[in-house]
Amino acid sequence: MNAPTPIHSPTHDNVHFQRSELSVILSLYGRFVAAGEWRDYGISALRDVAVFSVFRRTAEQPMFRIEKRPKMAAKQGLYCVIGMDGRILRRGSDLKTDLRVLERKLIRSVN
């Protein structure tokens, strides 16, 4: 008797952060942790977006999200920094430049 052959759906690679991108993000994260502003983070790799979420406490909703959306690279930029209220703080194609919007908040909190 022949066993039925399962039909495999095409595999889709999830979007993820490269090592160099994570290095830039974690460097900023470390500075905020040292300042006592951030305490936890989460990384999600989904089909069309990679998300780095920053939390003040583990059980809360994220304070900020750094998203990588390859489909938006040509239109509005590969990276997006989103605030707690869902507002887009910065969009662009250079991660270091886009994260400056958060570095300004670090300078304010230290002063």
Positions of predicted regions on the chain:
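Short, hydrophobic/aromatic-rich beta-strand segments within well-structured domains
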Residues: 53-54, 67
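General beta-strand recognition
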Residues: 51-53, 80
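Short, charged, intrinsically disordered terminal tails
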Residues: 6, 11-14, 100-111
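Acidic surface patches and DE-rich sequence motifs
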Residues: 9, 46, 56-58, 83
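Short aromatic-glycine-(Arg/Gly/Cys) micro-motifs in beta-strand/loop hairpins
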Residues: 2-3, 65-86
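Short, charged/polar surface micro-motifs in flexible loops or helix N-caps
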Residues: 47-50, 57-62, 72
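Negatively charged, low-complexity tracts enriched in Asp/Glu with abundant Ser/Thr
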Residues: 2-51
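Mixed-charge, glycine-accented linear interaction segment located at domain edges/termini
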Residues: 80-109
